[in-house]
């Protein structure tokens, strides 16, 4: 971490005198720059092109050095559009990698890949910046203890628990509740863990980024009246950006999260939406730099690029970064190199189901498809593991019986199967719960359910103690006591 001069500071003018180059070639977002002999910039150095285009418009383009070509030439990738640049324009070597603002002042704000605020709320009130390129923490700094990251969301904590400092893949199509789940996690980490979040929008739709910002303001995750009380910082590099920006925006978000972990010593949630677009941007840059493509046209450095990002997301003795990454699977092909490389790094998967969303069961997390490496008796304990397995078995049996029920009806089932179906339907409904961030839409107050309460509730359903209660009593409640109270209210209404 360091205090860096911004490019508008007088301190930069001395750099300008020292190391100036000139543009020799422009191919789309790729620039070749010639420097004086012996003054070649390092790989990953930031270069700044300032000047005016042919119609007198001000130009300020930042690039990142990717290759040293020989003959005093470097090849750099632009982080913004190169419209208006011409050969012969002056290029300033800043002498350092891209650096972005970090710390509490970033909360509630939206940044681009360069760490510049893009929300029209004025400059960021911090002089502390951090370079986006750094190595992963050393082994000696890592916290290797396996511990569960409690989210307060029943279906996640019971069936596919998150690891503190782990990486989770979030799979789901449009309109099944990905955004609401992300916002609830941001809200819960702030309330239960005193932590904050960083959201990296990598190569997704600008409209979705805008919608997310508006929803965060509406639900209180971003506090408009007192911006410092916000729980999240947003970093956007959307679909319309050049590939250089999309390739680096994930690192910008990660750098902000690392500062909160290492300096503020807090737990951080890092959301990356979408990790596939990070790979896709790397593939575009690789082709522009003239590298030979690898399998399915991807960059030959795919595993290295993915590893350099993912290995920085970890728990240290100071704090943890727990990352939730939306994963787009091209043509639903899980063997595609991009998702296949991502899977190697994931500790858990949360799969959202359109079928459950259609039934009105929110969060629409599929209890049978979602997985976690943490669901082992030696990590979560015998009681948790046994309860989770019995819940999955009951739901699996219900799934198998659905065809018979659809054709012949419930009456044709055996007594045992009818009991299984009744309990499975109660479990399915009890896996739903009201969210804090959805209060403004639903009118029902949100619920945070601790892990011990969650396990107790499902044990009571499985034991048959609650067989007499109507299944609608289990729908959209917090803990099991609320379900029994709701059942009594329903009984009272009938009378």
Curated annotation (Swiss-Prot):
**What InterPro entries does the database record attribute to this sequence?**
AAA+_ATPase (IPR003593), ATP-synt_VA_C (IPR055190), ATP_synth_F1_bsu (IPR005722), ATPase_a/bsu_AS (IPR020003), ATPase_alpha/beta_chains (IPR050053), ATPase_F1/V1/A1_a/bsu_N (IPR004100), ATPase_F1/V1/A1_a/bsu_N_sf (IPR036121), ATPase_F1/V1/A1_a/bsu_nucl-bd (IPR000194)
**Where would you say this protein principally sits, based on its record?**
plastid
Q: Where is it found, in Gene Ontology cellular component terms?
A: chloroplast thylakoid membrane; mitochondrion; proton-transporting ATP synthase complex
* Pfam families associated with the record: ATP-synt_ab (PF00006), ATP-synt_ab_N (PF02874), ATP-synt_VA_C (PF22919)
> What reactions does this protein catalyze?
ATP + H2O + 4 H(+)(in) = ADP + phosphate + 5 H(+)(out)
Q: Which UniProt keywords apply?
A: ATP synthesis, ATP-binding, CF(1), Chloroplast, Hydrogen ion transport, Ion transport, Membrane, Nucleotide-binding, Plastid, Thylakoid, Translocase, Transport
Offer an example of a GO molecular function term for this protein: proton-transporting ATP synthase activity, rotational mechanism
Membrane association type: Peripheral membrane protein
Q: Name one GO biological process term.
A: proton motive force-driven mitochondrial ATP synthesis
Tagged with keyword Transmembrane helix: no
Q: What is its EC number?
A: 7.1.2.2
UniProt binding sites for ATP: 172-179
Write down the SUPFAM superfamilies for this protein, in alphabetical order.
C-terminal domain of alpha and beta subunits of F1 ATP synthase, N-terminal domain of alpha and beta subunits of F1 ATP synthase, P-loop containing nucleoside triphosphate hydrolases
Enzyme class comes to translocase
What subcellular compartments does it reside in?
A: Plastid, Chloroplast thylakoid membrane
- Protein family according to the UniProt entry: Belongs to the ATPase alpha/beta chains family.
Q: Can you state the subunit structure given in the record?
A: F-type ATPases have 2 components, CF(1) - the catalytic core - and CF(0) - the membrane proton channel. CF(1) has five subunits: alpha(3), beta(3), gamma(1), delta(1), epsilon(1). CF(0) has four main subunits: a(1), b(1), b'(1) and c(9-12).
NCBIfam families xrefs: atpD
This chain's function reads: Produces ATP from ADP in the presence of a proton gradient across the membrane. The catalytic sites are hosted primarily by the beta subunits.
What's the name of the protein? ATP synthase subunit beta, chloroplastic
- Name the species this protein comes from: Eucomis bicolor (King's flower)
């Amino acid at each position: 971490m360091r205090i860096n001069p911004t490019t508008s500071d007088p301190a930069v003018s001395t750099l300008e005198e020292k190391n100036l180059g000139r543009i020799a070639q422009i191919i789309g977002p790729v620039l070749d720059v010639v420097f004086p002999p012996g003054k070649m910039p390092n790989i990953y150095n930031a270069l700044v092109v300032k000047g005016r285009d042919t119609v007198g418009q001000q130009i300020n383009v930042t690039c990142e050095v990717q290759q040293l070509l020989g003959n005093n030439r470097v090849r750099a990738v632009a982080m913004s559009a190169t419209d208006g640049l011409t050969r012969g324009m002056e290029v300033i070597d800043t002498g350092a990698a891209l650096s972005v603002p970090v710390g509490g002042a970033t909360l509630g704000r939206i940044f681009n890949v360069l760490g510049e605020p893009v929300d029209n709320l004025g400059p960021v009130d911090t002089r502390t910046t951090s370079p986006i390129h750094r190595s992963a923490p050393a082994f000696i700094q890592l916290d290797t203890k396996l511990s569960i990251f409690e989210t307060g969301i029943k279906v996640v904590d019971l069936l596919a628990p998150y690891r503190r400092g782990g990486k989770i893949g979030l799979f789901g199509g449009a309109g099944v509740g990905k955004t609401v789940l992300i916002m609830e996690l941001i809200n819960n980490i702030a309330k239960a863990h005193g932590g904050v979040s960083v959201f990296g929008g990598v190569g997704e739709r600008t409209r979705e980024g805008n919608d997310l910002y508006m929803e965060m303001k509406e639900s209180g995750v971003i506090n408009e009246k007192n911006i410092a009380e916000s729980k999240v910082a947003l970093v956007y590099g959307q679909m319309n950006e050049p590939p250089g920006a999309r390739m680096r925006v994930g690192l910008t978000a990660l750098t902000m999260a690392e500062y909160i972990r290492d300096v503020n010593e807090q737990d951080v949630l890092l959301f990356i939406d979408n990790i596939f677009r990070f790979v896709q941007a790397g593939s575009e840059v690789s082709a522009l730099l003239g590298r030979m493509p690898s399998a399915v046209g991807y960059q030959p450095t795919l595993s290295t690029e993915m590893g350099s990002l993912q290995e920085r997301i970890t728990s240290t003795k100071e704090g943890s970064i727990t990352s939730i990454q939306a994963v787009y699977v091209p043509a639903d092909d899980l063997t595609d190199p991009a998702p296949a490389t991502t899977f190697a790094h994931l500790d858990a998967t949360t799969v959202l189901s359109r079928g459950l969303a259609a039934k009105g069961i929110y969060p629409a997390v599929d209890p049978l498809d979602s997985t976690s490496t943490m669901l082992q008796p030696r990590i979560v304990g015998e009681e948790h593991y046994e309860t989770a397995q019995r819940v999955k078995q009951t739901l699996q049996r219900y799934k198998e019986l659905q065809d018979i029920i659809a054709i012949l009806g419930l009456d044709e089932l055996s007594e045992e199967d009818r009991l299984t179906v009744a309990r499975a339907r109660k479990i399915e409904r009890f896996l739903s719960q009201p969210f804090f961030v959805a209060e403004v839409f639903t009118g029902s107050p949100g619920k945070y359910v601790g892990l011990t309460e969650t396990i107790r509730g499902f044990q009571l359903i499985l034991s048959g103690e609650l067989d007499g209660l109507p299944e609608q009593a289990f729908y959209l409640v917090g803990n099991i006591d609320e379900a029994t109270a709701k059942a009594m209210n329903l009984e009272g209404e009938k009378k």
